[in-house]
């Protein structure tokens, strides 16, 4: 009868509901024999129900078994159900049922086999929290664990990063009558290596013989791979030699580990030699390279820019059907894109299709990422079109790349349109995508739009995270709303992203408190952003309090947080405070970074502590920290201000020897210093070097011109201004009016007139006041004709519009001693001066007759495409 029921159930495996009805009918029979038969068939029906995922029926089966009066059969049936659950990877159901069985039948000991089965299922399903209870229950039952049991327990502890506890359990094995086998050692060695304790893993390997167990190839490979990951290639080579001494032949896993490590270290040529040897296996007895080996080498060549070698290798992969894979194509695509070979990359996409290896979404996204990072957005849009034609729908990553590209070039409106297109195409944006746009809106000061986006993100359930909150905090700090930012950070600790409701009335109810899952807690970036804002505003006391709060939240400050204080203290000349922070920073194990040194050099420079600057730069060299353009420029600036011009020049030479390209500011300080000495020949030499390196930047010319003018070098200043006019530079930062006035005072009217004629002939619009000294001078000399000509020109210029090349008042501040004593740039001030000048009075009368009483200006000069404007790139 029992066999008949089992057969009937198995016959209806594909119809589980019918099988269940058959089982229930037999079980419900009043006959005790039928009742017992159905219990014996429990494992069969349980397997059918589990496979069909009939969870309600499984629970009903459990209740039916518990209601049975046949105790012995009832227990075995319950345990069989537990066993089936465990074997079917349903530990969440097996474990509570097992606990129930143990509470109902405490005197009956389950088998060690069942415990092992449950432990194995816990590990497979990553439910290690059940492991401890199971082991304790075994001990309470007095069941002796097997070596296999210990192997499972040690593995569970290692997977939970409890390698020390795993070692303690390993050491207990002899006391429990269990001898570790090669699997025990392999599990624990892997645990040590995973925890970064490779040397302890090696110690265990060396101790294996004392336990009567010989190391196998797997354990050696584990150690070799770990040494390789840590960059300890010499140690890995020693292990390979030791393998050979033990009679173990290194296999493909060993060699792939070595090649992978060498490529990661950039030693691709060394890896290539091993690869070449492997290809000659029939002579050297080495394993043949497999697809993993080829891909590792391809990635290595691409990483270091050996594209020709990579291309040759890829061609050999492409021609071999056993090696060619989507992964190989994607590696080659990534290599081409990383080095800007976009045309070749598009060719590879076509080759993939021809080869029958359809490009995946990842393949297209590699191209999208590269194009968008370089701002090649129209090309990126073309790729999106190609994807759609080939039946591949753009995903969140595709749109994210394009969105980031638009935001990077300030095309926020295009990014917003893209977000809408994304939603129309049923591609839901994630928090990362929205955060990109949110950051750009805040950065551009489009706060109301940022608020609207934030509200929509919440409505759509995109999950506001810490990154979102950090963007808002950064935006508020940048817009000077520090107090609001502080309020939000305080709220984040309590309410998570609901703290954004503190932004104002428009945010009330923005986030539902009931949905908070602590996914928006302030992190180091949050605190660092706020610390920077407070220090920038000079609110150091509040910054210190916030720093203490951060540590109270168990967030250990990193060098970035300390550097914020150091930088702002140095900037304010509080060098002692900066060094106190530095001392505390180093006590906490945070090392000085390039940013730290740059801040300290700035602070020491402000305090004119030149000797200490040299000391810091020497320390950087000792620690292998390379100075950058900021380091050199700051040091050069303060060396020049401290009259250490020779030292500053040496630094400039060192900078160029290290292939760090100087910028305008690198030369600015030296030019100013040499003019101050004065040593105009050296200043001229530095200027010429600057032009050859930085190009024809008008900032360099205006600097040199203004310095020559301030030093009274009128002839050299005139020559330079004429060169400037020939190059078509704008004159906004050139003190040309001062030059004209100085020339007139030196009775160099002809030279001054020549400059003005040249400016007029070249179509320059300039301050009409520049004409007044020449008009006055010509009038006094009796040259009325030319004086009247200039006066007419002045009136013509005054009637046109705004002055295009009006002298920048900031440029004048550094040369107050050369200013017109009557002050001001407005030519009307000169017309109103009472110096007896008839020309001035006549010009004034013309203005009163209808030439205009407002701001006097002139026309724009023709715009020249090749102009290289001076950008603040220091």
Swiss-Prot record:
Start-end of each PPR repeat: 111-145, 146-180, 181-215, 216-250, 251-285, 290-320, 325-359, 360-394, 395-429, 430-464, 465-499, 523-557, 558-592, 593-627, 628-662, 663-693, 697-731, 732-766, 767-797
Keywords, sorted A to Z: Repeat
Any one Pfam family match given in the protein's UniProt record, by short name: PPR_1
PROSITE patterns, sorted: PPR
Top-level taxonomic group: Eukaryota
Entry coiled-coil feature ranges: none
InterPro entries: Pentatricopeptide_rpt, TPR-like_helical_dom_sf
PANTHER family in the record: MITOCHONDRIAL GROUP I INTRON SPLICING FACTOR CCM1, PENTATRICOPEPTIDE REPEAT-CONTAINING PROTEIN
Homology family: Belongs to the PPR family. P subfamily.
Name the record gives this protein: Pentatricopeptide repeat-containing protein At2g17140
Native species: Arabidopsis thaliana
